Amino acid sequence: CRGVAVLPEGMSAERFAWLERWVTHAEDIIRTPGTESNVREIYAECEVLAKDPANQILNQFSQFENHLAHRAVTGPALSRCFERVARGRPGMTLAAFVSATGSAGTIAAGDYLKDVFGSRTVAVEALECPTLLRNGYGAHNIQGIGDKHVPLIHNVMRTDLVVGVSDQATDHLDAVFQTEVGRAYLASRRRVPEAIIAALGDFGLSAICNVLAAIKTARYLGLGPDEAVITVATDGADLYPSDRRALFARQYAEGFDAIDAAEAFGRYMLGAEGHVLELSEVDRHRIFNLGYFTWVEQLGVPLEDFEARRSQRFWRELVASLPELDARIAEMDAEVARA
């Protein structure tokens, strides 16, 4: 059994280099036209592959096991993280969980946290492609978050806010976090502790996006010091040196200096606000309905199955199927062990 990866050709060179270390055949990496937001082109390629009955398509945007895994694993893991911090902060509450939508796997942890703590669930997307915010479209460079459509596994009707983050913000803050001059600015002018500066150096573009969205959420909701916001650093900086070099060549040909670092930090971190939508019931139905055009019209999901997801009963029954899924995994593991 060979694994085949299908992803846009505009992704970083480092991402492709990482994949190349894991495949035995170069043709097992299929590059589709476009950038991060060109998801439809991936589906088209998968439709071609699916014509061969020997191929099994694993679509993280539509297979509910992705939702279940994050709800059952990521959610409790984040709960334990919060509880550990809260033990030292009596009275602390969990106000929100913030996650870029991507395939809508990680954001499923918000359902678990909402059940346990009553927290809000915040969906994040690139401002250059404001699908959830405005039914919009466009290209962007926040690699790791998909858009131009609403994933089938996204429990839209339990989402509370949507936040847009510009790829200009993530690109330029990446420059601050990854350069000596940027780190020196954070230490000397902003008094950021060295441990935090070191941690920021590990963050990739979608990780920075999530952090900015968490800041926007806290500011929009007017949260205080005892109202926590949880987010996740979903990728690493080691995936983006080529993108960073391209940014410097494009905008900082004469060098990235302390003034550039200060301007980037002031504009994109200290000025992180706006493009936040608190969802009404009408907004939720609008976003839910938008998924019709991908899943029913283009990909043939039966309308009845599509509509069933509008009710929380569907999602509760999905969670109830977890023991069956665990049994299937155990059966597969045993079969692999015998082989």
Give the ranges of each region predicted by the language model.
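Hydrophobic beta-strand scaffold residues
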Residues: 3, 26-29, 57, 121, ...
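Short glycine/serine/threonine-rich phosphate/pyrophosphate-binding segments
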Residues: 1, 12-16, 97-111, 131-132, ...
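Active-site/ligand-binding-proximal alpha/beta "capping" segment
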Residues: 49-104, 108-109, 169-204
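Active-site-proximal loop->helix
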Residues: 1-48, 131-144, 148-151, 242-246
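Active-site/ligand-binding loops adjacent to catalytic centers
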Residues: 43-44, 50-54, 113-202, 243-339
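Glycine-rich beta-alpha junction loops
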Residues: 62-65, 101-105, 125-130, 149, ...
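Conserved acidic residues
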Residues: 27, 55-56, 92-95, 119, ...
